[in-house]
């Protein structure tokens, strides 16, 4: 190794053979046969090797495509219920990526792309299903809100912004982005105002559907590179969307009425089955019978409906399902809060009646699983504020009365405190 003064035995100043810095500008300079390398270049080489190893591992993971049953089992770890939707999604996603990996280019058989439409109430798990799927397959994933989109040239986000967000998620690696998953939420909010073609400009409804058509079907989008307007001289990135999987979702409030009207119209005449109001189907059962014509009647244009041939319906979560969501998934909310308290050395216990009270409250708010975290945050806020400053607290117990606001959480102190209390009681 060169000496600390930055000179060799002959007094000559030494330089890194890679970056050109002299020894006075770096911490270490390692000598080889007629060459030198500094500690900064060593770190850089390590980073390059580490990235290549990670990429090779990721490519190795991509080579093995999990079977539909494996995909379904992974979804079960994170999403409670929605069995039919999981099955539909597992098969659709498996076939999509099988199509990409097979790369069939035959004159006889061309495998088309099957994008997915998720229909279900707020908080039923639409976004979580798509997100979990992307994580399992190790592909880039982004979420877009259809209500913020407008036609190009109008105030709002262009549909190309969706692809830019996906590129950002994978550090502008175009090849990775082209195999990613895009979830567009609130798609029902861009339905046209009537089922007749619009003669006036509808920039946030039918216009957005038209703009999304090519993107979903497959087109080459020109996306500004990193920096965007700051570096206008840079060439635009060309991103092919034909291999991206698009999942669109929405609550579609009122769709059940459209379906019911169609079914009832089909049951008119002497042979019609007479149904009483008592025999009305549950909302989930009605939505499960959705047909493309119902979606067109609701306000989606026929061309858009044709681009999302796979339809999966999700049911509204019951109180029992919400209790399961609180405790059973791998990253359940209760497990998260238990871990947070454990980091303070405190055990957190939720009684069974407390879990039921939380689920009941979420049902009353009609927010599905999405409302569970806000309820727990509200209940635990003061405790999370106080506990880090309190000594000797070993356990916090939450029961139903805490959830309803009738009492405070029970704090249990260490054995010394408990013995003092026992002595006083004695």
Swiss-Prot record:
PANTHER family registered for this protein in UniProt: ATP-DEPENDENT CLP PROTEASE ATP-BINDING SUBUNIT CLPX-LIKE, MITOCHONDRIAL (PTHR48102:SF7), ATP-DEPENDENT CLP PROTEASE ATP-BINDING SUBUNIT CLPX-LIKE, MITOCHONDRIAL-RELATED (PTHR48102)
Gene Ontology CC annotation, any one: HslUV protease complex
Name this polypeptide is given: ATP-dependent Clp protease ATP-binding subunit ClpX
Homology family: Belongs to the ClpX chaperone family.
Residues that, per the record, bind ATP: 121-128
Subunit structure: Component of the ClpX-ClpP complex. Forms a hexameric ring that, in the presence of ATP, binds to fourteen ClpP subunits assembled into a disk-like structure with a central cavity, resembling the structure of eukaryotic proteasomes.
Domain ClpX-type ZB: 4-57
HAMAP family, A to Z: ClpX
GO molecular function terms attached to this record: ATP binding; ATP hydrolysis activity; ATP-dependent protein folding chaperone; protein dimerization activity; unfolded protein binding; zinc ion binding
Disulphide connectivity of cysteines: none
Protein role: ATP-dependent specificity component of the Clp protease. It directs the protease to specific substrates. Can perform chaperone functions in the absence of ClpP.
GO BP term, example: proteolysis involved in protein catabolic process
Domain of life: Bacteria
SMART domains to which the protein is assigned, alphabetical: AAA (SM00382), ClpB_D2-small (SM01086), zf-C4_ClpX (SM00994)
Record-linked NCBIfam families: clpX, PRK05342.1
InterPro entries registered for this protein in UniProt: AAA+_ATPase, ATP-dep_Clp_protease_ClpX, ATPase_AAA_core, Clp_ATPase_C, Clp_protease_ATP-bd_su_ClpX, ClpX_bact, P-loop_NTPase, Znf_CppX_C4
Pfam families for this protein: AAA_2, ClpB_D2-small, zf-C4_ClpX
Species annotation: Chromohalobacter salexigens (strain ATCC BAA-138 / DSM 3043 / CIP 106854 / NCIMB 13768 / 1H11)
UniProtKB keywords: ATP-binding, Chaperone, Metal-binding, Nucleotide-binding, Zinc
Residues annotated as binding Zn(2+): 16, 19, 38, 41
Keyword Chloroplast among UniProt keywords: no
């Amino acid at each position: 190794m060169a000496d600390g003064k930055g000179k060799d035995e002959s007094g000559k100043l030494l330089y890194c053979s890679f970056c050109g810095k002299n020894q006075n500008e770096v911490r270490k300079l390692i000598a080889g046969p007629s060459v030198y390398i500094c500690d900064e270049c060593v770190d850089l080489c390590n980073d390059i090797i580490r990235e290549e190893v990670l990429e090779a591992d990721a490519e190795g993971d991509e080579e093995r495509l999990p079977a539909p049953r494996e995909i379904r089992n992974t979804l079960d770890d994170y999403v409670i219920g929605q069995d039919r939707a999981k099955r539909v999604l597992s098969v659709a996603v498996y076939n999509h990526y099988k199509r990409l990996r097979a790369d069939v280019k035959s004159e006889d058989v061309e495998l088309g792309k099957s994008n997915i439409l998720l229909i279900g109430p707020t908080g039923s798990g639409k976004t979580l299903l798509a997100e979990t799927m992307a994580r399992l397959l190790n592909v880039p994933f982004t979420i877009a809100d259809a209500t913020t989109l407008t036609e190009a040239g109008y105030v709002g986000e262009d549909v190309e912004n969706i692809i830019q967000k996906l590129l950002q998620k994978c550090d502008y690696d175009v090849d990775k982005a082209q195999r990613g998953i895009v979830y567009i939420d609130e798609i029902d909010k861009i339905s046209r105002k009537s089922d007749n073609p619009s003669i006036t400009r509808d920039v946030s409804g039918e216009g957005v559907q038209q703009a999304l058509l090519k993107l979903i079907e497959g087109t080459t989008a020109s996306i500004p590179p990193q920096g965007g307007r700051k570096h206008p001289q840079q060439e635009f990135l060309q991103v092919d969307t034909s291999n991206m999987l698009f999942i669109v979702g929405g609550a579609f409030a009122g769709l059940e009425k459209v379906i019911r009207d169609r079914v009832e119209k089909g049951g008119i005449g002497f042979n019609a089955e007479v149904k009483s109001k008592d025999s009305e189907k549950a909302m989930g059962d009605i939505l499960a019978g959705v047909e493309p014509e119902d979606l067109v009647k609701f306000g989606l244009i026929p061309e858009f409906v044709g681009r999302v041939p796979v339809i999966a319906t999700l049911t509204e979560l019951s109180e029992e399902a919400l209790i399961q969501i609180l405790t059973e998934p791998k990253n359940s909310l209760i497990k998260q809060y238990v871990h947070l308290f454990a980091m303070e050395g405190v055990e957190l216990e939720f009684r069974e009646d407390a879990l039921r009270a939380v689920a009941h409250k979420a049902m009353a708010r009609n927010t599905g699983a999405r409302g569970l975290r806000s309820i727990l945050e509200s209940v635990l806020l003061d405790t999370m504020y106080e506990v880090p400053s309190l000594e000797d607290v070993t356990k916090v117990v939450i029961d139903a009365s805490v959830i309803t606001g009738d009492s405070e959480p029970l704090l249990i102190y260490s054995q010394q405190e408990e013995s003092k209390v026992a002595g006083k009681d004695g």
